[in-house]
Each structure stands twice: as structure tokens, then as C-alpha cells.
Amino acid sequence: MSRITERFTVLRGQGRKALVPYITAGDPQPQVTVPLMHAMVAAGADILELGVPFSDPMADGPVIQKACERALAAGTSLLDVLAMVAEFRRKDQETPVILMGYLNPIEILGYRSFAEQAAAHGVDGLLTVDMPPEEAEPLAAVCKEQGLDRIFLLAPTSSPKRIEQISALGSGFIYYVSLKGVTGASTLDVDDVSQRVAKIRHYTTMPVGVGFGIRDARSAAQIASIADAAVVGSALVKRIEQYQNRPEVIPEEVSALLRTMREAIDATENV
């Protein structure tokens, strides 16, 4: 059982939902990332999602695009991100870590080399936003060999066939993108998300995480009442951007926002 599956199993047994924060690794400086990861776990994060900075993050909105620019300007590479995970693992062997990003850096390293190094450094799962499931089998196969969960996105427009396809090919959990468009996009329609998550559950037993559009404690709690996990990214990355010139305060500032989300989710669960 992977760390991701184990975490969802434990949470389900406790009647709790996962809080999954996203940050771009190396933003605003590489030395901030690992302390921030530990701070987010202390603030109530159940699974961590690390963005691998890329020069053309087409699925991301302006907030995460700027984060990628800052991380790349600071010299952050895919190998640096793997080293950050290894450093995190020296103190935390329990919290699952997912890498989220684009295919190009992985292709440059090579599928097998990437999967072997990712597993050796303590990565638990991979989500590549620009690789459709029709093309994913070679990378998914080497990830499976190394015990890495292969996580896929579902959109509001995804068909039942696509849901079944991703359920068969993926593992860990399904990531439902609650809004059309890029990360950081507009208003969250909770009723629509509820209906679509119910539809996804009809075709799979995998946990369902929902991301895009979670901005604050209220929206995090709303999503957690529907799905197995609330994934929050742009709101945290905005906080990092706000304090980019005071990197020493970033772990506490981001954690403060994350704690409000954790408290709201837990309060909803206890109603």
C-alpha cells in the first residue's frame, strides 16, 4: 500500500478529509521549500503537492506562472526538487509527497531514470498536467514498477469513458478540476461540484480530491464536505508572493492560512 493510499485509508477510518496544499518548489528561494513543507504538515496538511517549476506552465494562471518564474530564476531544477523531497524525508517519513508539473523535464531526464530517482528520494506520486491518459502508459508503467502513484486530472467535461479510463490507469486518488480554465480561476459552484463528484464516484472507488477555486477556509470546508480531499494552491502561492522579500516569515504566514482551512474542515466534519 502506498503512502497516499494509506493516508486516505486512515483518514476515512477517522471520518476525516484530506487537506492537500500545493506550493511551487523553489519559490521564492530553494532554501524556503523544505521548512515550508514541514510547517504545512504542522498546520494540518495531510498530503503535500510540490510543483516542479517549468518555463511554460500552460495550465496555470498568473499566480502560479509567476511562482514558476521566481523558482526558475532562483535556479530550481527537477533534480533540485527531488533533493528537497529527500531532505524533507530526513525528518518526515509519513507525509505523502506528490510532484505536479509538466512532462518536458521528465522526458529530458528519461522516464525510467525519473521514476527510479523519484522513488529513491521519497516521492509518492506524480501528476503531469499535459499528458493525457491515452499517452500515459509508458510513464505509468515505470511509475508503477517503482511504487509511485500515477494521478490524473478529470475536468467538468470528462465523459464516463474517460473516468473509467483514468480509474483503470491511475492510482492514489483522482484529481477533479472543479473549474474550466487555468489554476486560480473564478468562482466555485459547490452544487455543480457535488453533482460531478457523485458522478465520478459511480465509476470508481478511488478517493476523489478537488482542486481549483479553493481560496479560503469556507471554500475548503465546502469542498471537503463533498470530496475526499481539498487541494489548495493559488491562495497559498499568493501568500508566498506577498512575502517573497521576507522569505524567513513565509512558513508561518502560509501555515496561518492553512490552519484556518484545517479548522474549518474539521469543524464541518464534527457537525
Curated annotation (Swiss-Prot):
Which E.C. number(s) belong to this protein? 4.2.1.20
Keyword Repeat tagged: no
- NCBIfam families associated with the record: trpA
Q: Which Pfam families match?
A: Trp_syntA
Q: What is this protein called?
A: Tryptophan synthase alpha chain
Please give the catalytic activity noted in the UniProt record: (1S,2R)-1-C-(indol-3-yl)glycerol 3-phosphate + L-serine = D-glyceraldehyde 3-phosphate + L-tryptophan + H2O
Family, per entry: Belongs to the TrpA family.
Which PANTHER family does this one have? Answer: TRYPTOPHAN SYNTHASE ALPHA CHAIN, CHLOROPLASTIC, TRYPTOPHAN SYNTHASE, ALPHA CHAIN
Its biological function?
Answer: The alpha subunit is responsible for the aldol cleavage of indoleglycerol phosphate to indole and glyceraldehyde 3-phosphate.
For this UniProt record, the keywords arranged alphabetically read as follows: Amino-acid biosynthesis, Aromatic amino acid biosynthesis, Lyase, Tryptophan biosynthesis
